[in-house]
Swiss-Prot record:
Pfam families (UniProt xref): p450 (PF00067)
Protein name: Allene oxide synthase 1, chloroplastic
Cell location: Plastid, Chloroplast
Disulphide bridges, residue numbers: none
Species assigned in the record: Solanum lycopersicum
GO biological process: defense response; jasmonic acid biosynthetic process; oxylipin biosynthetic process
UniProt-listed CDD domains: CYP74
Length: 534
């Protein structure tokens, strides 16, 4: 999802071993019990602790680096209207995203250059950007002392606030704006107040997913993952964060479908849907779709969240946020950020693991089952910290195909940005853009950068590379706060991704897939699920 930031609270909290009975009152109708699960942890896991000291802090003196040659940022924007339109056609159709950037790197002999980013006219009238495509220049986009993030969540255009109840939600706020800190605090509160439920509810929701896939495999010989994952993801988020089973409400099973339509009206200028090129470019990339067409769908989602988030809305009023604004933000954080992240990342991660083959599957199954067995059969955060291969696989999946592909920032003042090869002067007000898959596959940082290396982040040397995993609008070794734009749900995303692998390989020895394309992430079809044999 383009420029998506998963705005849910960071898991910097201990998970108590007890479970609140009051939070389970709405969930009896969907409980699935296969094995005991306890949401507990003996200590705060290392992956959410403070960054370790860098190697440069050792006793040996630092090596003085040669001054990089100063260059003018290469490239241009072309003629008004014509240049942005031509770049848009190249980006979507003539070249595609990766070739669009690769060809310009080759043309300019630089990973920093000027171009136009979609959608351009007549949705965005100022699509001019300076592109950053290497791991050295890219991190400036996270430095809020140097760049402003106001209204840049989706890039060179901002969807109508009619799609979010008339409010600019948290993802579009710069940390300098007063409501940013208040709303981010509210997101932290959301998860901390429901921390007991995350691991058990993930188990329940994804056990239902696996049963659905098994039934479809047995009757049809193959099973589509994406739609089933969408339903499981929405059920999990509603149950764990709001204590409600959607199927017991007026919403029923419509949540994912309603979210899909609503997200389409926000992101259509950035998507390819497979329509005839001329028609798609005219309808999807040239003019905005009217928000009124999804008003009723959005109202159904809003009603669901308003009715089932009383305690969080009470907290919002204490912080100084109206219940209405808070609810629109909760909806956005849950449906766009969190649901959208799971929708994209889970299929992408399974694509890479599926392609890696049975040997990796066996190694993961052995590691996961051994640790859980020694932990009395309980899945806990502390237990997952003892699974180095599983953790590395999650980080490698986030590195090689980050769910957040794009980042933007507007220069707050004149500055100098450095790539590996040169330095460039940037003027105040210029819009900076980074395409993250290039930064996280920088061959000057990662060996075999284009390959999926499952054990890349194991051991001391592997852990040093985590600072270059950037999917969360910040480094993996840094933490979200009210003062930055790093994804408030960074650790939540890592946790649920780990849980998916644990649940999968506790249940199955291996799986086989077919991979197709979709507007958001990979389309996965399962052709085989081999039940656990040991």
């Amino acid at each position: 999802m383009a420029s998506t930031s998963l705005s849910l609270p960071s898991l910097k909290l201990q998970f108590p071993s007890h479970t609140s009975s009051s939070s389970r009152k709405n969930s009896s109708s969907y409980r699935v019990s296969i094995r005991p699960i306890q949401a507990s942890v003996s200590e705060i896991p290392p992956y959410i602790s403070s960054p370790s000291q860098s190697p440069s802090s050792s006793s040996s003196p630092p090596v003085k680096q040669a001054k990089l040659p100063a260059q003018k940022v290469p490239g241009d924007y072309g003629l008004p209207l014509v240049g942005p339109w031509k770049d848009r056609l190249d980006y979507f159709y003539n070249q595609g995203k990766n070739e669009f950037f690769k060809s310009r790197i080759q043309k300019h002999q630089s990973t920093v250059f000027r171009t136009n980013m979609p959608p351009g006219p007549f949705i965005s009238f100022n699509p001019n950007v300076v592109v950053l495509l290497d791991g050295k220049s890219f991190p400036v986009l996270f430095d809020v002392s140097k760049v402003e993030k106001k209204d840049l969540f989706t890039g060179t255009f901002m969807p109508s606030t009619d799609l979010t109840g008339g409010y600019r939600v948290l993802s579009y706020l710069d940390p300098s704006e007063p409501n940013h800190a208040k709303l981010k605090k509210l997101m932290f509160y959301l998860l901390s107040s429901r921390r007991n439920e995350v691991i058990p509810e993930f188990h329940n929701s994804y056990s239902e997913l696996f049963e659905t896939l098994e039934n479809e495999l047995s009757t049809k010989g193959k099973a589509g993952l994406n739609a089933a994952n969408d339903q499981a993801a929405f059920n999990f988020l509603a149950r764990s964060l709001y204590g409600i089973n959607p199927q017991d409400t007026e919403l029923g099973t419509d949540g994912p479908k309603l979210i899909g339509k609503w997200v389409l009206f926000q992101l259509h200028p950035l998507l390819i849907l497979g329509l005839p090129k001329v028609l798609e470019d005219l309808v999807m990339h040239t003019f905005r779709l009217p928000p009124a067409l999804v008003k009723k769908d959005y109202q159904r989602l809003y009603n669901f969240f308003y009715e089932n988030s009383t305690s969080v809305l009470d907290e919002a009023e204490k912080i100084g946020i109206s219940r209405e604004e808070a609810c629109h933000n909760l909806l956005f954080a849950t449906c766009f950020n969190s649901f959208g992240g799971i929708k994209i990342f889970f299929p992408n991660m399974l694509k890479w693991i599926g392609r890696a083959g049975a040997k990796l599957h066996s190694q993961l199954a052995q590691e996961i089952r051994s640790v859980i067995s020694s932990n009395s059969g309980k899945v806990t955060m502390a237990a997952m910290e003892k699974m180095p291969l599983m953790k590395s696989v999650v980080y490698e999946s986030l590195r090689i195909e980050p769910p957040v592909a794009s980042q933007y920032g507007r220069a707050k003042h004149d500055m100098v940005i450095e790539s590996h090869d040169a330095s460039f002067e940037i003027k105040e007000g210029e819009l900076l853009y980074g395409y993250q898959p290039f930064a996280t596959k920088d061959p000057k940082i990662f060996d075999r950068s284009e390959e999926f290396v499952a054990d890349r982040f194991i051991g001391e040397e592997g852990e040093k590379l985590l600072k270059h995993v950037l999917w969360s609008n910040g480094s993996e070794t840094e933490n979200a706060s009210i003062n930055n734009k790093q994804c408030a749900g960074k650790d939540f995303v890592v946790l649920v991704s780990r849980l998916l692998l644990v649940e999968l390989f506790l249940r199955y020895d291996s799986f086989e897939i077919e991979v197709g394309a979709s507007p958001l992430g990979a389309a996965i079809t399962l052709t085989s699920l081999r039940r656990a044999s040991f």
